[in-house]
Amino acid sequence: KEGYIVNYYDGCKYACAKLGDNDYCLRECKARYGKGAGGYCYAFGCWCTHLYEQAVVWPLPKKKCN
């Protein structure tokens, strides 16, 4: 599974500015989803890879980013 890491509080994606390989995104994806996860900046959001099937990713149901 893959997807954008999401802030549970506000429903927004984790933003990033440096597209492609991005230490911030990689660190955040690993912190949320475990050391086997990967991450990079895609379309100015942190995209996480190698996730378990039940991983919660953006968009959150009933939670719109403001």
UniProtKB/Swiss-Prot annotation:
Name which cysteines form disulfide bonds: 12-65, 16-41, 25-46, 29-48
Task: Mention one GO biological process in which this protein takes part, according to its record.
Answer: defense response
A molecular function (GO) term: sodium channel inhibitor activity
Looking up SMART domains in the UniProt record yields: Knot1
Activity regulation, in the record's words, is:
Is susceptible to be neutralized by human antibodies scFvs 10FG2 and HV.
Q: What are the GO cellular component annotations? A: extracellular region
- Write down the InterPro entries for this protein, in alphabetical order: LCN-type_CS_alpha_beta_dom (IPR044062), Scorpion_toxin-like (IPR003614), Scorpion_toxin-like_sf (IPR036574), Scorpion_toxinL (IPR018218)
What free text does the record give on domains?
A: Has the structural arrangement of an alpha-helix connected to antiparallel beta-sheets by disulfide bonds (CS-alpha/beta).
Please give the family membership noted in the entry: Belongs to the long (4 C-C) scorpion toxin superfamily. Sodium channel inhibitor family. Beta subfamily.
Q: What does this protein do?
A: Beta toxins bind voltage-independently at site-4 of sodium channels (Nav) and reduces peak current and shifts the voltage of activation toward more negative potentials thereby affecting sodium channel activation and promoting spontaneous and repetitive firing. This toxin is moderately toxic to mice.
Name listed for the protein in its UniProt record: Beta-mammal toxin Cv5
Please tell me the species this chain comes from. Answer: Centruroides villegasi (Scorpion)
